[in-house]
Curated annotation (Swiss-Prot):
BP terms from Gene Ontology: tRNA threonylcarbamoyladenosine modification
Keyword Iron tagged: yes
Matching Gene3D superfamilies: 3.30.420.40
Similarity comment: Belongs to the KAE1 / TsaD family.
The protein's name: tRNA N6-adenosine threonylcarbamoyltransferase
Location, primary (coarse class): cytoplasm
The reaction(s) this protein catalyses: L-threonylcarbamoyladenylate + adenosine(37) in tRNA = N(6)-L-threonylcarbamoyladenosine(37) in tRNA + AMP + H(+)
Amino acid sequence: MLVLGIESSCDETGLAIYDYTSKTLVADVLYSQIDLHKKYGGVVPELASREHIAKLNILTKELLSNANINFNDLSCIAYTAMPGLIGALMVGATFAKTLGLIHNIDTVAVHHLEGHLLSPLLDQSSDIKYPFVALLVSGGHTQLFEVREFGEYSLLGESIDDAAGEAFDKTAKLLGMSYPGGVEVANLAEKATDKKKYDLPRPMKNKPNLDFSFSGLKTAVLNTWYSETDQSYENKANLCYAFQEAAIDVLVTKCEKALQKTGNKRLVISGGVSANKLLRSKLDILSKNKGYEIFFPPMKYCTDNGAMIALAGAYRYANSFRDSNLEINVKARAQI
C-alpha cells in the first residue's frame, strides 16, 4: 500500500511516498523556504502560501520520477490539515484533494503533530513498541504525551507560554543572530570558554506537574545580555551555553518525571529540537543510567517533512480513516 504524503503547514514544502506493507520510505523531496523568509526575520504567511503553490506540482513530478511510480500505484494521498498557517494548509489540502479527484484516489487528513509523534518510525532499525511517552519539542510546540496505541494520545503536559524551539529562536534574535537562530545558538554554545559565567533560571523544573515555561528563561537572557558591559563574541557564546543548558535541563527533567509518573520505559522524542546534540546526549545518559529506551527520528526528519505525513497517513488509512467528501477543512490550531 503506497501513500503519498504532502506537508505544507508552514515554510517547508515536503512530499514523500511511504509503503505501509513493507514499512519503508520509498522516496521523499523537500523544499525549504528559509532563505525566502530570512530577510524578514520570520515566516511571512502570504509568501509561504504562494511558494507552496509554485512548488507543489514541480515537487510531485520529481517525487514520482524518483520513485519510478505513477498515480495509479497510489492507494491514498495524505495531507497536513492542522495545525499551521491557514493559507499554507489550504494550499496543500486543495492540491491533495484535486489530485485525488482527478486520479480517483482516496485522501486522508493528517494532524501535523501526529506526524511528528510517529516520525521515529521512519528509522527502520528502531523497534518502538506501545505504550510510550513522547516529547514533541519544536518551534511551535512543547508537549508531553502518553501514547498507548496508534491514535490513542493523552496530553501529560505542555508549555504554558513559549515553546522550547521558539525560545531558542528568540534568544538568537536577542543576540543579533539571523533567522532561524536555534541552530546558531546551539553551535555557538559549543564555543563557550567560561561555562560558569552565567547562571540562568530553569522555570518549572521542580514543579510536580509536567508543564513547561520558557518565557522567563528568554527574559533572563534579555536582561543578562542588556546588563552585560562586555558584549564580546566570547560572552555571547557563554550566554548561549547557559541558555541551552537551562532549556535542555528542563526538558530532560520533565521527560524523566513523565516516565516515572506513567511507569513507561520507552521515550520518543520528535520535532525540530529533537535534532539538538545536547538534548540527545543528556537523554542518552538518562537511558544508560535508568534503563530507558529512547528513540529519535533520523536527523533529516526532525523538522517538518513529507515523510512523516506519508507515514502517519498510511497508518490512518490502514485504520479506515479517509475523507468522505471534497470539503477543505483545515485548522490553524488543533489539539491532537
